Every structure is written in structure tokens, then in C-alpha cells.
């Protein structure tokens, strides 16, 4: 397979075709089984976080280092010239991109990564832009699903919780729609999946259902994707009302399919109780670990032609 990801901006999961997603998953699997600590030797990658992050930033920087690359950047954009001196994002990107071979950005404003790609002289990878897209999270989700199910095809997938602002569920739904999966959206009315995602599913002829409880679909699921209500996107009164809308307990897992796996982009608050952690269905910590391999795969394919023949 030709590596069409080489030197490409990765802003939205919709920037990637089905074959490209399959190539990334295959590359992640190869790098997990056979580490390659020299692939990014002499490559410099900028890691620029204008919004708080733990797992995304650390797994991305770990991915660069384990491939032999070097990192420049910052974990808090508030302490940069953009944050302190009023420099524009466009100017910051033009300067920083002149120092590196790839530019990884997280920002709290929707569209910031796309804007960065217009001014960057090197490929831009979106690490999350507001409530819009989070494509690298989607890649580790796809890898985790493939790893546990042996396929991405024709799966029964439920998304639960904050589907309105949860950028991870937007991106993953778009990706899995390329693999003929059936979707079940479980959310309170205030947090329903955005209309544009539903419209895309309709256009593609994908099956989906809407629910306010998990009970009626639990026994049919292959993947249960839980999300937290994102406190940073609500005022305190609304957050307190919504935060406990859906809580998964171990008792709710009676009668589920043997192959069911529970995923969560983390951090969790109280939407998955700790008694679920010890069940054979919990996979969210392994999922987080897979972030390193998925981001290694993406970096390798964007910056080299090493795995184009997988």
C-alpha cells in the first residue's frame, strides 16, 4: 500500500480514508510488536499545548522519544508570547514550524488546528481543538478496537454520556462509519450527538439508534464507549445536574457478550465505578497505553516512508 499519509496534515479524522486508517492500525500493531527506536532519528517534533492535557501530551512525547526523535514545545500556551504578549496564533505557528519537522497542537478553540495548518511549513497534527475533533485519540481507539475484536467491520458500538461536546465520540463515529458498524447513542437530551454527525450517518446509510438508558442494548454490544461530562464546558449548576446522567457499574455487565470491551478516553469522574476495573470487559487503561503506539504509527507515516508497504 502506498503511504499517502506522508507529509500530510492530520486535522480531522475525515482527512483519512479507510485504507489510510487501516495502514495506521497495521503500523501501530507492528510497532507494538517490534519497537523501532531509530525511525525518527534527527527529526524534531514540536509539541504545543494551548489546552490542558495529561495522556495526549505524555503519550505523544513518549511516542516521539521511543522513535528516536527530539521534542520542542510547551505544556501551557498561557506562558508563551501568544499567551503573554498578544502574538497571533498564525505568527506563532510560522515561527515554531521553522524549527521542526512536524507540529502537534492542542487548542481550546475549534478550528485552531486547521488555521495552524495554513501557516505551518511542516505537517500539522491536531491533538484536539475545542469540542470539534481529536483524530489521534480516534486512532488509538481504532487500534484498541481492532486489537480486542480482530476486526473493525460490522461491530455494535454504543457511545454513552456527553455526545454533544465530546470530540472523541465525534471523530470515532466518523471513522467507524467507514466500516459498516451500527451505532447506539445513549445520552440525555442536553447532550445528544450533533446533527452534523447524524446527517453524515444518514448520508452513508449507517444504522443508528438513540437511547436514554443502556438497559435495552447492553446484551448486543461489542464496544461500549463511555465518556465523562466535561466540566470545563458547562457552568457549575448545569454540570452538577448532568454529571451523573449515566453511571456504569459491574452489576450492569451481567449477560453481556463475552467479547465486549469497555473503552473510555479518560479521565473518568464517576461514570464508571471502580468495581468495573477488575472485570474482563474493562479495557480503558490498555486503551490509554495504546496511545503511544497509535501516535508512533502516525508520526512514522507522516514523517517517513518506512511502512508504506504494510
Curated annotation (Swiss-Prot):
Transmembrane segments annotated in the record for this chain: none
Molecular function via GO: amino acid binding; aspartate carbamoyltransferase activity
Amino-acid positions noted as binding L-aspartate in the UniProt annotation, renumbered to this chain: 85, 167, 228
Annotated catalysed reactions: carbamoyl phosphate + L-aspartate = N-carbamoyl-L-aspartate + phosphate + H(+)
GO cellular component, one term: cytosol
Keywords of this entry: Pyrimidine biosynthesis, Transferase
Pathway named in the protein's UniProt entry: Pyrimidine metabolism; UMP biosynthesis via de novo pathway; (S)-dihydroorotate from bicarbonate: step 2/3
Record function comment: Catalyzes the condensation of carbamoyl phosphate and aspartate to form carbamoyl aspartate and inorganic phosphate, the committed step in the de novo pyrimidine nucleotide biosynthesis pathway.
Family: Belongs to the aspartate/ornithine carbamoyltransferase superfamily. ATCase family.
Name of protein: Aspartate carbamoyltransferase catalytic subunit 2
Organism per entry: Shewanella halifaxensis (strain HAW-EB4)
